[in-house]
Structures are given as structure tokens and as C-alpha cells.
């Protein structure tokens, strides 16, 4: 086995359970000519079986030692190694129809999910291993304790499905939390979408800044500009009770009313 030591600063937990690897690859269902990008290949647990099924793979790896190892293990015509922090990579550069996969570092999972939204037009689907708690928030419904800003922002852009849990023992070193695998497929171009992505993001962030308080109080100076009845939002509603479509309507209404602090598209 490799002498490579997991580096805490990179949030490294290497997947070692072959049955879990097989389940992930089966869920992805790669075809020979698929355009696949793997984030954080680590010790190649997913890289190997993916390359058994596809012609070429692009891997994004921040750890220079692991990047060098990958270059030694696989020929350049089969594997392109991008040695970089995934948070700085423009995934749109890899072309259309991308299938993005990876055992994501848990310490940057939410920022990375938001970063990847910028390339959603180029993406066919995404399959990620994440902390189970994060995935529960991603797929949560309004009214549940897990429903959050992350839920709203991602559900406005993706159709998501939690596939299965993964025990800590499947990793080396084992994390202190249970993991899970999620499938994310970008919604079509004709989806319900806000007039301004920036305004939508601002409104959702402000709404969840005090999630237990009534939304009218949290929005404060915007409350008088909001057509509450038209949006179907109850006077006592909290952010965690408001659906994605209602948040899109809320952001659009505030933008149209000239609410201060909202950037026009």
C-alpha cells in the first residue's frame, strides 16, 4: 500500500472500500466516450475503475505529490492531471456534457458546490461523496430542520438525489462523520429562474441569516416592498418554510420594486 500520508490541510480521507467504489461507479454508469472530470482523485480509488470504462479522464488534484504519482501511473493520453485547487478551476473550460465526480474534501464542500454552479450549463451530471449532513441539507424540503440556504440555492439549479450512505470505515483515515453519495443533474434551460442570480443569492442569504425569525422581520426595510399574499408567503413564515419557487418570486418582486442593495442584471 502507498506510503502517502493523508494531509489534514487538504481534508484528505482516502476511499479504500472496493464495494463502495463499485457502487459509485455503477451509479455513474460511465460510457466509453464520456467526458469525465474527477475532483480529488487521491490514491486512484475511483480513477482506476473509471479509466477501465472510459477513453480519457481529467483529474483535478491540489496535492503535488499525488499529482506526480498520477502522472507516473497513467499515460498522458489517458489521464490529464490538472494540479490546482478545485476552487480556482474554471470547469467550463473542459467543454460540454461534463460528468463531474469525486470524493470531495469535506472542509471545502459547500464553497466547491457553489463554485461548480458557474459551470452548470456545461455539466451533464455530478456524482459526489460528501458528509451525509451536507447532502441531507442539499435535498431537504421546506419545513424540515435541514432546509437551508444551501438547499434553496442548489435546488434552484439542480435535480438532486441522495443515493446511499458510506460508513467511516470505508476510508483511511476514517472521518469522524458518516458520508453519503449524491447525484446532481442540472435543471433544463426552461426551468424557473430568477431575473437576477445576484439578487436571488442576496435575498436568500439575508433570509437565512436569522432562520428562526419571521421573514418579514429579517427582511426589515424590504418587507413593505414585498407582495406577500401574491407570493403565497404567510405573515408568520420563516425562511425555512419558504419554497424555492417562492424565493425566486420574492427576489424578482424586490428587484422590480427597486429594493436597496439588490444589483440589477
From Swiss-Prot:
<keyword id="KW-0949">S-adenosyl-L-methionine</keyword>
<keyword id="KW-0963">Cytoplasm</keyword>
<comment type="function">
    <text>Specifically dimethylates two adjacent adenosines (A1518 and A1519) in the loop of a conserved hairpin near the 3'-end of 16S rRNA in the 30S particle. May play a critical role in biogenesis of 30S subunits.</text>
</comment>
<dbReference type="GO" id="GO:0052908">
    <property type="term" value="F:16S rRNA (adenine(1518)-N(6)/adenine(1519)-N(6))-dimethyltransferase activity"/>
</dbReference>
<feature type="binding site">
    <location>
        <position position="85"/>
    </location>
    <ligand>
        <name>S-adenosyl-L-methionine</name>
    </ligand>
</feature>
<feature type="binding site">
    <location>
        <position position="103"/>
    </location>
    <ligand>
        <name>S-adenosyl-L-methionine</name>
    </ligand>
</feature>
<dbReference type="InterPro" id="IPR020598">
    <property type="entry name" value="rRNA_Ade_methylase_Trfase_N"/>
</dbReference>
<protein>
    <recommendedName>
        <fullName>Ribosomal RNA small subunit methyltransferase A</fullName>
        <ecNumber>2.1.1.182</ecNumber>
    </recommendedName>
</protein>
<dbReference type="InterPro" id="IPR011530">
    <property type="entry name" value="rRNA_adenine_dimethylase"/>
</dbReference>
<dbReference type="InterPro" id="IPR023165">
    <property type="entry name" value="rRNA_Ade_diMease-like_C"/>
</dbReference>
<feature type="binding site">
    <location>
        <position position="15"/>
    </location>
    <ligand>
        <name>S-adenosyl-L-methionine</name>
    </ligand>
</feature>
<dbReference type="InterPro" id="IPR020596">
    <property type="entry name" value="rRNA_Ade_Mease_Trfase_CS"/>
</dbReference>
<dbReference type="GO" id="GO:0003723">
    <property type="term" value="F:RNA binding"/>
</dbReference>
<comment type="similarity">
    <text>Belongs to the class I-like SAM-binding methyltransferase superfamily. rRNA adenine N(6)-methyltransferase family. RsmA subfamily.</text>
</comment>
<feature type="binding site">
    <location>
        <position position="13"/>
    </location>
    <ligand>
        <name>S-adenosyl-L-methionine</name>
    </ligand>
</feature>
<feature type="binding site">
    <location>
        <position position="40"/>
    </location>
    <ligand>
        <name>S-adenosyl-L-methionine</name>
    </ligand>
</feature>
<keyword id="KW-0489">Methyltransferase</keyword>
<dbReference type="Pfam" id="PF00398">
    <property type="entry name" value="RrnaAD"/>
</dbReference>
<keyword id="KW-0698">rRNA processing</keyword>
<keyword id="KW-0694">RNA-binding</keyword>
<dbReference type="GO" id="GO:0005829">
    <property type="term" value="C:cytosol"/>
</dbReference>
<dbReference type="InterPro" id="IPR029063">
    <property type="entry name" value="SAM-dependent_MTases_sf"/>
</dbReference>
<dbReference type="InterPro" id="IPR001737">
    <property type="entry name" value="KsgA/Erm"/>
</dbReference>
<keyword id="KW-0808">Transferase</keyword>
<feature type="binding site">
    <location>
        <position position="61"/>
    </location>
    <ligand>
        <name>S-adenosyl-L-methionine</name>
    </ligand>
</feature>
Amino acid at each position: 500500500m502507498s506510503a502517502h500520508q493523508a494531509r489534514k490541510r487538504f481534508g484528505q480521507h482516502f476511499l479504500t472500500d472496493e464495494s463502495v467504489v463499485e457502487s459509485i461507479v455503477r451509479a455513474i454508469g460511465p460510457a466509453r466516450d464520456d467526458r469525465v472530470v474527477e475532483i480529488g482523485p487521491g490514491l486512484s480509488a475511483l480513477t482506476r475503475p473509471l479509466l477501465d470504462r472510459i477513453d480519457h479522464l481529467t483529474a483535478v488534484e491540489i496535492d503535488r505529490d499525488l499529482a506526480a504519482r498520477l502522472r507516473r501511473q497513467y499515460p498522458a493520453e489517458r489521464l490529464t492531471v490538472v494540479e490546482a485547487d478545485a476552487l480556482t478551476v474554471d470547469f467550463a473550460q473542459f467543454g460540454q456534457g461534463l460528468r463531474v465526480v469525486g470524493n470531495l474534501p469535506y472542509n471545502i464542500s459547500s464553497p466547491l458546490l457553489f463554485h461548480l454552479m458557474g459551470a452548470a450549463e456545461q455539466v451533464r451530471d455530478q456524482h459526489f461523496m460528501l458528509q451525509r449532513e451536507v447532502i441531507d441539507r442539499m435535498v431537504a424540503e421546506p419545513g424540515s430542520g435541514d432546509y437551508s440556504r444551501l438547499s434553496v440555492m442548489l435546488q434552484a439549479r439542480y435535480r438532486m438525489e441522495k443515493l446511499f450512505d458510506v460508513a467511516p470505515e470505508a476510508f483511511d483515515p476514517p472521518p469522524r462523520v458518516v458520508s453519503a453519495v449524491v447525484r446532481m443533474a442540472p435543471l433544463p434551460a426552461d426551468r424557473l429562474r430568477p431575473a437576477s442570480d445576484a439578487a436571488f443569492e442576496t435575498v436568500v442569504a439575508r433570509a437565512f441569516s436569522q432562520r428562526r425569525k419571521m421573514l418579514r422581520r429579517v427582511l426589515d426595510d424590504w418587507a413593505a416592498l414585498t407582495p406577500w399574499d401574491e407570493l403565497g408567503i404567510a405573515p408568520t413564515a420563516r425562511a425555512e418554510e419558504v419554497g424555492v419557487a417562492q424565493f425566486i418570486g420574492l427576489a424578482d418582486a424586490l428587484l422590480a420594486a427597486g429594493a436597496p442593495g439588490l444589483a440589477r442584471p
